[in-house]
Structure formats: structure tokens, C-alpha cells
Amino acid sequence: MEKEMRNLMLLVLLTVILDNGIGKCNAKSEEDQDGNARNNRIDKNDDNSDSIEKYLREVTDELSKILAKRIYRDIQLRENNKKAENRQSWIGDLENLDIDSTVQRPPGLWGREADFDNTRAHDSAQISDEKQSGLWVGDAKPPGLWGRDAKPPGLWGRDAKPPGLWGRDAKPPGLWGRDAKPPGLWGRDAKPPGLWGRDAKPPGLWGRDAKPPGLWGGDAKPPGLWGRDAKPPGLWGRDAKPPGLWGRDAKPPGLWGRDAKPPGLWGRDAKPPGLWGRDTKPPGLWGRDAKPPGLWGRDAKPPSLWSKDNNVIKSRSDDAKPPGLWGRQVEDGPTKIWGDGFLDAERHIRLLKNDERFNRLEKKADMEEELRVAQGPSVTNAKDTFGELADLLRKRIVKRLHKNDSLNNRRNNKKNNKF
């Protein structure tokens, strides 16, 4: 690029010199020659000057186009190198993940919003009562359940390219897109050994209409060799419906296209058997609107929910928020709590024992309960303290609700800005 810039500057300098030389020649000819000769010389010099300037303009324009292309290509190359470095750095971060760091992440779990305390998640002996795997609150991303931005092993977002699972354009070994040509699996135009397309002529084959044993022409579909429209076992096109598969288009086990719905992973509109809820709720993996057992969203109403007013477990209240039950708008406690299903009030408060404010309120409630037992049933301070606990938890829920709404709004705006 520096060489082209230097050449361009030399051309500009040459243009200036030629302009000055032509002007001096014109002045000298006017002094030495008579009127007719002077006019003829001026006309001739003007013609030469115009032709030279025209040639220089053409050369300069052509070099400018070449230089612009070089600059654009250099910018694109730098951006691609930067993306490659960022991707390599991301992969290196995953490989060098330190689970003993300040912010802990259990093995096999990565996400932008995952947040764990200093408990070593991989050591089962150090997992306390509130660290029961299987259900996470708030923005935590447990293994086997991932949010929109989480990147667990074996399941990635639109642009990620992990080993074993790729997007639309990726070409991993063993799984290929429309134009890829892997060994053992071929597209329309591929020419692998032992399998040929329409025009291929492998050694030992026969003419167009011949029908040797074990090899068929025309529209025949022999076992083990398939043409463009053939449907071999284990591999189906977009519209093929093999036995045992389900979903909107084609869903073969082990190989999935753009619209395929493999077992255990369903899209927004897929309705596999045994699922429930408003949209798609497969067991073990949930989408944006999914409602797994023990975890309910905005509109779900599980049995035996907490009452909003008196903090008592009731049957199905409209605005109830049971402890241990977290949806899109429900706040987790001051510490990360795991559990299966929802918990009663006493267990929920006991699991919050590591928080100082809850611990202080619980001790105060115990002291007031002892005082009530000693003085008689007229003392009701213990009940008020437990009500204060419930109010504090409710404030946490409302605060988290607003935080999640603002985060979702930012994500939606960012997604809309991309398109």
C-alpha cells in the first residue's frame, strides 16, 4: 500500500511539472513567433497538453481504484485476523478454565451470566445444602440447562464453532452442510470412491442403460448406493419422513439439517410427545418460553403457591411466588439456591442462613420466640420478624424483576439493531 501511495504522489508531481513546462513553452512561442505561427504553435501545444492531461487523469483514476481496493482488502484482512484472534482467545479461555478462581464455574458450564460463589462446584463434598444441582435461580446456568447466551459444551449459539456441532457454514468432520464433501457422506456433485454422481465414470462400471449385478442406472435405488433423490437409511432430506421421527420437517437421529428436530432438542414450534405448557417444554432442555417441572415462567401456576400477602402456602394464587420457584420475573435469594421443585417457608429460610441480614433476622425471631414462650402467647414479635423476612425477600424479587426486564430490553434492542 505504501508503494502505491508513493507512485500516486509521483504522478501528481509529474502532472504539476508538465503543466509548468507547457505554460513556459507557450509563453516563449508567443514572444518569438509571429501571429500565425504563434497561433498554430499554441493550438498544437494545447492539443498536446490536453492529451497529456487526459492520459494522466486516466492513469490516476485507475491507480486510485486499485489503491481503494487494496485498502479495503487490507481492512477486511485485519478484521478477519482480529476475529480469528478473538475466537482463538475464547477457545484458549475455555481450555484453560480455572474452576478454583474467584468466580467459580462448574466444569462443562460457561455463560455470560453464570455466577457462582467461592464454593468449588466440582467437589461434591463441598457442595452445601443450597447447592443441589438440577435447578438454578436467576441468571445461573447449570449443566443441562442453558439460557439464550450460554455456551455449554456440545451446544452453541449462531456463530460459535465448537468441536462436534457447527452452524450453517461450518464444515466439521462427520457433519457437513450443503456443499461440503466429507469422506463417507456426499452431496449432489461429490465424487467419493465407490459412489458416483450422474456423469461420473468410475473404473469397472458399465454403460448408461446396462444393468450389471449390484449396480443400477436410471432411477433405481440399490442398497448402499444412492443418487440425488434416494433416501438411504439413517440419512433423510428436508421433506423425507423416516419411521420413528417427528417434527415439522425431517428429523433423523444423529444428523440434523437446518429445520431438523432431533430427539431431546426441539424448536419453538415443535411439539414432541410428553411435553407440556404454552409453547415448547421438553424435559431436560428448555427454550426461551419453556416451562420445565419445578420451574415456572410468568403465566405458569404450579400447585401450592405462596400467598403474596400473608406468606402462607396456599393453593393457586394469581400473583403467588413460592420459595424455591424461579421464573422469568422471580428473584433468587441473596445466595444461589438449588433445589428440585418449590420449598416450604421454613426450609427456604434455613437455606438462606449464610446471608447476614437473614441470619440476623432469624436469630432475632428465635430470641423473640423464646421470649414469647416464656412470657405467654400475647407476644407477637416473632410473627412480625418473619413478616419482615418475607418483605425483604419480596423486595429482592421486585428488584430482580426490574433488572431482568432491563436486561431483556437491551438484548432485544441489540438483536434488532443487527438486522
UniProtKB/Swiss-Prot annotation:
Subcellular location: Secreted
GO BP annotations, alphabetical order: neuropeptide signaling pathway
Keyword hit for Cell wall biogenesis/degradation: no
Propiece residue ranges: 28-104, 113-140, 149-150, 159-160, 169-170, 179-180, 189-190, 199-200, 209-210, 218-220, 229-230, 239-240, 249-250, 259-260, 269-270, 279-280, 289-290, 299-300, 309-320, 329-419
This protein's UniProt keywords: Amidation, Cleavage on pair of basic residues, Neuropeptide, Repeat, Secreted, Signal
Segments of skewed composition (Basic and acidic residues): 120-132
Region (Disordered): 27-48, 120-332
PTM annotation (Tryptophan amide): residues: 110, 146, 156, 166, 176, 186, 196, 206, 216, 226, 236, 246, 256, 266, 276, 286, 296, 326
CC per GO annotation: extracellular region
Tissue specificity comment: In planula larvae, expressed in a narrow ring of ectodermal neurosensory cells around the widest circumference at the anterior of the larvae. In primary polyps, expression is confined to endodermal cells of the hypostome. In mature polyps, expression is strong in the epidermis from the tentacle level to the base of the polyp and weak in the gastrodermal cells in the apical hypostome.
Signal peptide limits: 1-27
Repeat among keywords: yes
Function summary: LWamide peptides may be involved in induction of metamorphosis.
Family of this protein: Belongs to the LWamide neuropeptide family.
Annotated protein name in UniProt: LWamide neuropeptides
